[in-house]
A protein has these predicted regions:
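Bacterial N-terminal signal peptides
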Residues: 3-12
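Non-catalytic carbohydrate-binding regions of carbohydrate-active enzymes
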Residues: 730, 734-763, 794-915
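Non-catalytic C-terminal accessory modules of carbohydrate-active enzymes
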Residues: 55, 66-68, 74-134, 138-143, ...
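Hydrophobic, small-residue-rich alpha-helical packing segments that form membrane-like cores
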Residues: 691-725, 735-738, 742
Length: 915
């Protein structure tokens, strides 16, 4: 009866008319016995909860009970769309006949609390009540269990009628083919290149290759558009283009499509193999070339030894690449490769690209139907289609595929069935690497388990596996069926095609072994996953909106994490929005729950920063683009990178009370601070912002800026704290001596009397009096690290009030990033960086208000943001970097790393870092 009553109550609630969404408290018979959250009608949420764990890959389960994309098969980029031949079917057979329906036709409500989803189904004349709990093992404090590549599905079936019913649930799964670096197709942030073999070029000779960037409303229109390309593209002095340089996209067209980056490379022989071209990103941009001349319509580049020139010129619909031999000897085996990072309609999440052998083009399309292509009137001999972050290395190394390789047949698969009284499991895998999946149904008293066997005429492909569980239900009876999905794809590769693997392959030798582990530990995995949620939901000082946000905000730990075979653990900024490995300005915010709950993994990542620290002390901005772990670069946002590393190192030390950690990281801290001090070019004690971009990378600051200055001051305080802890009195005094003039300059240059202005460049007699919502970020971090106040208390309190009354004025759904003194929104940044609202900054503002003793300023704004995400947008499992402050709609940066900073509200409100 204890099991039956909650089920009956929840079924009655599901059958009630849909009301306005709100937070509720829901009860279950096992952990978490109480859930505080939003129970959505099916189809209302605009995001799907990811099932998966730390570095395992994920599969999405949407509010209809459908599997809507996966990132399991050696790829971290999700393959979107509802998965065909996949899902659950429920059948009820009795004296009146048999009724069989797919689960999505039955689901009525959906309650997501990562990593669990509770679905209520039935009604609509169906003779059974159905309650489904889907869960992946995820245990705060236990990284090993949290990295189990499996999902568990529990069905509770209720017979409300007066007659006996034979109930069956069938589970079918279309096993994804293992993703390999084939170079013929990709899904996500697609890029690629086309290549031409131009032969030998005699002295004085030249060759021209025209390249077109074409957009079309549909694939059907593309061939016609290729015949008459129109439009223009942007071109810089390096014969290339990178949207980040100007904060805008190229290739505007009425039918959609945009061009984020383009560039080229040459490979040839001249007394030995040579290469020359543009790297598009990083510094320096050019290899083997120097700028000779630049006009808006063309760029002339030359080899330093005078052996060749490359002229890149704008033509209708594209660019022309003219290569001249300006030397005295022939250039042998000349090859040209042209690169493009294209989007079909500026919607990165579902872009799909491929090398089309028929068109001789790199084609990109998305769910809108719009498409674009990189093509030429001169047929290419080769090319590559990949994902941004790994393709540029191949471009520079001339590692494309010949055109006759642009078509590949899928690999064969082997399958086997395991059937005994305990369970029925069907495994489908690639015999080479044992890569594949196992679907299983667990046995039990009165449970009949059956492997899925498609009829010979079935249209299901051979990769589909499936199992069925059957039980008898008497009148009023409740019975349970348990299913699980396990996966094993051990051959993951980095962007350059080198093996990186998965950590879980050290514990398991195939998906069947994963399934056995999950089956034997079913109760333990569900119980421990639910218990930490109970501690959050049971905390009386947490409002409902915050409890719901804390639990669900952890989803990026499944979506964006990588745990490699060699043990390295990292997070991506956003695998579908901006795939960069451990972007430090995002980690600064988003690593808070990792430091709280998985300290060994936090140390793991921080040690990688130690390993990648440059000889001059500079800390890298990231470990690499895309799926890259050993290509660090330090120039991007260098005015923040080293300071933020120091603050994270001290945060970890302070929270863990770990003197050994302090001793390990202290030498790197001193080197990082020494490098950061070199960025004070005018001697005012503050870092100069014009030296690089910062967190708002499409919004340039100059001179001293409130955002970066505050972080620098807090970092100096952290350096002094390290020195004091370790008994280094001389270095403590050095840090404090550097801190004092910096604080004075900050007050003199940035304090307006009500708030800290955006920036002030006294050398140029120029400044911006914009009020930045995040101007107190350095003070926020000083608070959370236990470093006290680095700004005058009366000023930071005044600034908090001013931010609330200006950046938070009106009915905005998040603090507007920049407000001018006249109350208008700052438009000086591009891509919305100045005039939109960054989600994380509202969470951080609220936390700062709590630390400063002004909760009434921050908590209402945090609550408004949380309600927008949960009740208006339905985007709890896909939060972006920024949103439209007026409409509340998500904008750029899907599934974003930094938003996990909401977890600092737990510490600020409760005064502790543990559950």
């Amino acid at each position: 009866m204890r099991m039956l009553l909650p089920l009956l109550l929840s079924l009655l609630a599901a059958a009630a008319p849909a009301a306005e969404l709100g937070y509720g408290t829901f009860h279950f018979p096992d952990p978490p016995r109480t859930v505080v959250g939003v129970r959505y009608p099916a189809g209302v949420p605009r995001s799907a909860l990811p099932l998966g764990g730390l570095g395992t890959g994920t599969v999405y389960l949407d509010s209809h009970g459908r599997f809507t994309g996966q990132a399991l098969a050696n790829s971290y980029r999700p393959a979107g769309g509802v998965m065909a031949n996949t899902g659950f079917t429920v059948t009820a057979a009795g004296a009146g006949g048999s009724d069989s329906r797919p689960l999505p036709a039955l689901v009525q409500t959906y309650l997501g609390h990562f990593p669990m989803a509770d679905l209520e189904a039935g009604g609509r004349g169906f003779p059974l009540g159905v309650q489904v709990r889907a869960c992946s093992p995820f245990v705060l404090g236990d990284a090993r269990l949290s990295a189990t590549p499996a999902a568990l599905f529990r069905f509770r079936l209720h017979n409300p009628g007066r007659r006996r019913v034979r109930a069956a649930v069938s589970f079918r799964w279309d096993t994804p083919l293992p993703s390999e670096a084939t170079g013929t197709q990709a899904q996500g942030n697609v890029d690629g290149f086309l290549s031409w073999r131009l032969g030998d070029l005699a002295p004085g000779g030249e060759v021209v290759v025209p390249v077109f960037f074409v957009t079309a409303r549909s694939l059907a229109d593309l061939k016609q558009e290729l015949a008459r390309p129109v439009g223009t593209v942007d071109l810089d002095a390096d014969g290339a283009f990178n949207w980040e340089d100007g904060g805008r996209q190229s290739l505007p067209a009425g039918q959609g499509g945009c061009l984020s980056q383009h560039g080229f490379y040459l490979h040839y022989g001249a007394g030995g193999p040579r290469r020359a071209g543009t790297l598009v990103v990083g510094s320096p941009r050019l290899e083997g070339l120097v700028r000779a001349r630049y006009r808006r319509h063309d760029a002339l580049l030359a080899a330093p030894d005078g052996s060749l020139q490359v002229q890149v010129s704008k033509i209708t619909g594209g660019l022309a690449y003219r290569v001249r031999n300006t030397g005295r000897q022939a250039l042998s085996d000349l090859r040209l490769s042209v690169y493009a990072n294209l989007e079909a309609a500026h919607s990165e999440g579902d872009d799909r690209g491929w090398l089309d052998a028929g068109l001789g083009a790199l084609v990109v399309t998305d769910g809108t139907g719009a498409c674009c292509a990189l093509a030429s009137s001169r047929p290419p001999e080769g090319g590559w289609c990949g994902l941004w972050g790994g393709t540029l290395t191949r471009l520079a190394q001339d590692e494309g595929l010949l055109r006759n390789q642009w078509r590949q047949a899928p690999r064969g698969r082997g399958s086997r069935v395991n059937l005994d009284y305990q369970w029925c499991a069907v495994t489908r895998e690639d015999p080479r690497h044992r890569a594949g999946c196992t679907a299983a149904v667990l046995g039990g008293r009165g449970v009949v388990t059956i492997p899925y066997q498609p009829f010979p005429s079935s249209a299901a492909p051979p990769e589909v596996v499936g199992v069925t569980g059957e039980v008898d239900l008497g009148p009023g009876q409740v019975r349970e069926l348990r299913f699980l999905l396990a996966w094993f794809y051990p051959d993951a590769r980095d962007g350059a095609g080198s093996f990186v693997g998965h950590q879980y392959a050290r514990w398991f030798d195939g998906s069947l072994a994963v399934a056995r582990f999950a089956a034997r530990n079913w109760d333990l995995l569900l119980r421990r996953t639910g218990e930490w949620q109970e501690r959050i939901y049971g905390e009386p000082r947490l409002p409902a909106w915050l409890a719901d946000q804390l639990v669900n905000s952890l989803y990026p730990l499944a979506r964006n994490t990588c745990w490699l075979y060699d043990g390295r653990f990292t997070q991506s900024e956003s695998f579908i929005g901006c795939p960069i490995t451990e972007t430090i300005v995002c980690r600064f915010y988003g690593s808070i729950p990792l430091a709280m709950f998985f300290p060994e993994l936090e140390k793991n990542t921080m040690r990688q920063f130690l390993r990648h620290q440059r000889a001059d002390g500079a800390i890298p901005f990231a470990f690499g683009n895309g799926e890259s772990w050993d290509s660090p670069y330090c120039e991007t946002q260098q005015i923040l990178d080293s300071s933020e590393f120091v603050l994270m190192a001290w945060r970890d030390c302070a929270w863990w009370q770990d003197r050994a950690w302090a001793q390990e990281v202290y030498p790197a801290v001193k080197q990082a601070l020494a490098f950061a001090r070199t960025l004070d070019t005018d001697g005012d004690g503050l870092i100069n912002d014009q030296l690089s971009r910062q967190y708002y990378d499409c919004w340039q600051f100059s001179g001293a800026a409130s955002y970066t200055s505050g972080i620098w001051l807090a970092a100096l305080r952290a350096g002094a704290a390290f020195a004091r802890l370790l008994g280094d009195a001389d270095y403590e005094q050095q840090c404090l001596a550097a801190l004092r003039p910096g604080q004075k300059s900050s007050e003199r240059k940035l304090w307006t009397g009500r708030y800290y202005r955006l920036w002030n460049d006294t050398a140029r007699a120029d400044r911006s009096d914009t009020c930045l919502a995040a101007q107190l970020t350095g003070q926020w971090y000083a608070y959370l690290c236990g470093l006290g106040e680095v700004l005058p208390r009366e000023h930071l309190l005044a600034a908090l009030e001013h931010i609330g009354s200006t950046n938070g004025a009106g009915a905005v759904w998040g603090l507007v990033n920049g407000l001018c003194p006249d109350g208008s929104r700052d438009q000086s940044g591009s891509n919305g960086h100045s005039a939109t609202a960054t989600l994380g900054e509202t969470w951080c503002y609220a936390a700062t208000c709590l630390y400063a003793g002004r909760p009434e300023l921050g908590l209402p704004r945090a609550e408004r943001l949380a309600r927008n995400l949960a009740l208006r947008q339905g985007r709890l499992w896909n939060t972006t970097w920024n949103l439209d402050p007026d409409r509340g709609e998500m904008l750029w940066g899907d599934q974003y790393y930094s938003n996990m900073c909401v977890w600092d509200l737990w510490g600020a409100l409760l005064g502790r870092r543990r559950l």
